[in-house]
Amino acid sequence: MDSNTVSSFQVDCFLWHIRKRFADQKMGDAPFLDRLRRDQKSLKGRSSTLGLDIESSTLAGRQIVKRILKEESDSEPKGTITSVPTSYYLTDMTLEEMSRAWFMLIPNQKRVGSLCIRMDQAIMDKEITLKANFSVVFNKLETLTLLRAFTDDEAIIGEILPIPSLPGHTNEDVKNAIEILIGGLEWNNNTVRISEILQRFTWRNSNENGGFLLSPKQKQKMEGTTGPEV
């Protein structure tokens, strides 16, 4: 096994431990807690894949970080915060909507990259809205936390979520997964609306003037799958 893979896992375990202690002191906001839960699942999956114990890896990671901090204490940091692209978190859903349990009468499940698509094929003739919580960097969706499909009476009938044990997803993965979910829901004569915030950061492309426009194909798809404005 590559030594960098092991040390990377060890450092990730220790940093998650620090973040968990921060959250235990009631200082974490909703996006912070969302990422904490997601990363915990990811670490468990990596632990199983690599055959490494999380507790012992956390201790090893502590030693690595301690050594780095000691080295940094005698020298100026080589990077600056201004060189890091600004990332921010956007929410369509409340914590209650994200954590609410739901079940499917006729389950259908697909996978796009590291994203899992789940939908209830028993739902017919409904007005459905897609909502999502995700992070944005460079004005594009960076990481999807969770997307869910809601009926007008707030019932959950579908979702797209990352698979914790697999590597990260791309903006294109998210778009493809949304199109598959829409296609599955429309098959049963449902009308699907995509929230404005999700459209804005998932389907936008830069034009020559620095603005953002849907491509002709995407615009046709959105017009065909988004219900009328009220």
From Swiss-Prot:
Q: How does it assemble?
A: Homodimer. Interacts with host TRIM25 (via coiled coil); this interaction specifically inhibits TRIM25 multimerization and TRIM25-mediated RIGI CARD ubiquitination. Interacts with human EIF2AK2/PKR, CPSF4, IVNS1ABP and PABPN1.
Instruction: Please quote what the entry notes about the protein's domains.
Output: The dsRNA-binding region is required for suppression of RNA silencing.
Name listed for the protein in its UniProt record: Non-structural protein 1
What Pfam families has UniProt attached to this entry? Answer: Flu_NS1
Which keywords fit this entry according to its UniProt record? Answer: Eukaryotic host gene expression shutoff by virus, Host cytoplasm, Host gene expression shutoff by virus, Host mRNA suppression by virus, Host nucleus, Host-virus interaction, Inhibition of host innate immune response by virus, Inhibition of host interferon signaling pathway by virus, Inhibition of host PKR by virus, Inhibition of host pre-mRNA processing by virus, Inhibition of host RIG-I by virus, Inhibition of host RLR pathway by virus, Interferon antiviral system evasion, RNA-binding, Ubl conjugation, Viral immunoevasion
> Where in the cell does this protein reside?
Host nucleus; Host cytoplasm
Which molecular function terms from Gene Ontology are attached?
protein serine/threonine kinase inhibitor activity; RNA binding
Task: Map motif Nuclear export signal onto the chain.
Answer: 137-146
For this protein, the record's InterPro entries field holds:
NS1, NS1A, NS1A_effect_dom-like_sf, uS15_NS1_RNA-bd_sf
Q: What does this protein do?
A: Inhibits post-transcriptional processing of cellular pre-mRNA, by binding and inhibiting two cellular proteins that are required for the 3'-end processing of cellular pre-mRNAs: the 30 kDa cleavage and polyadenylation specificity factor/CPSF4 and the poly(A)-binding protein 2/PABPN1. In turn, unprocessed 3' end pre-mRNAs accumulate in the host nucleus and are no longer exported to the cytoplasm. Cellular protein synthesis is thereby shut off very early after virus infection.
The record's region (RNA-binding and homodimerization) falls at 1-73
Modification after translation is described as: Upon interferon induction, ISGylated via host HERC5; this results in the impairment of NS1 interaction with RNA targets due to its inability to form homodimers and to interact with host EIF2AK2/PKR.
The record's principal subcellular location, in a coarse class, is host cell
Q: Which residues form a coiled coil?
A: none
Q: Some GO term, biological process aspect, for this entry: which one?
A: symbiont-mediated suppression of host type I interferon-mediated signaling pathway
A single GO cellular-component term on record: host cell cytoplasm
Signal sequence, start to end? none
| Record carries keyword Ubl conjugation | yes
The record's region (PABPN1-binding) falls at: 223-230
Region (CPSF4-binding), start-end ranges: 180-215
The sequence motif named Nuclear localization signal is recorded at 34-38
Family stated for the protein in its record: Belongs to the influenza A viruses NS1 family.
